[in-house]
């Protein structure tokens, strides 16, 4: 026993571990947390420009004021945030009317747009513009009348023309619409007789081409500077000449076959 006491007194003392406390006792010793502060947040709905302009136009009209009416109870943002978003603009307008009861003007709204609210949609037209628009309408109506009416109403020999526009009132005898005065340019170069002849020749050519079913290719232009075109030698195809006697024999043979076919009696059972 004396040796153990000497060792402990000598400086090398054995340190025992600290005792662990239960959780029930430790919770009572911990500091109390601070209470959480709740803050109210105001939410504003961003309105588009079109609806803002429409609301300003409707708000400018004078409306009768109703007195002795209790205001609607306002709800907190925590209970119904959606309702506050929808009715934010109407509540602001009611507050402005309560603050300024003497003024009958609409509340001023800061519209965040470069386009001003009070825009004249239909600017005043000049007298000249109105007259020109009437003339244009009259010209179109006269053109429709000239196309749809008979040639007796608007004859080409008529000298007096009361129209103030440049559209013609002439209808040809054939019933076709006029070329707005350009038909004179077509007929000015050649007289009527030559024009009729040329039209007849072109019609004959077109009928021949339709019958043959082939259009002759255009001949190449040999007068090209710096280009030498080799002449192509084309051989003419020899067509076999059929004699008249052979044609008569073929015709007689075909006629005999047709007669036999007509005499044959077909019986269907």
Curated annotation (Swiss-Prot):
Residue span of region Disordered: 1-39, 56-110, 146-169
Motif (KEN box): 85-87
Region (C-terminal Sororin domain): 247-269
Biological processes annotated in GO: cell division; double-strand break repair; mitotic metaphase chromosome alignment; mitotic sister chromatid cohesion; positive regulation of exit from mitosis
Keyword terms, alphabetized: Cell cycle, Cell division, Chromosome, Cytoplasm, Mitosis, Nucleus, Ubl conjugation
Pfam families xref list: Sororin_C, Sororin_middle
GO cellular component labels: chromatin; cytoplasm; nucleus
Keyword field contains Coiled coil: no
Post-translational modification note: Ubiquitinated by the APC/C complex in G1, leading to its degradation.
InterPro entries noted in UniProt: Sororin (IPR018605)
Skewed-composition ranges (Polar residues): 57-66
Family assignment from sequence similarity: Belongs to the sororin family.
Free-text comment on this protein's domains from its UniProt entry: The KEN box is required for the association with the APC/C complex.
Protein's UniProt name: Sororin
Lineage of the organism: Eukaryota, Metazoa, Chordata, Craniata, Vertebrata
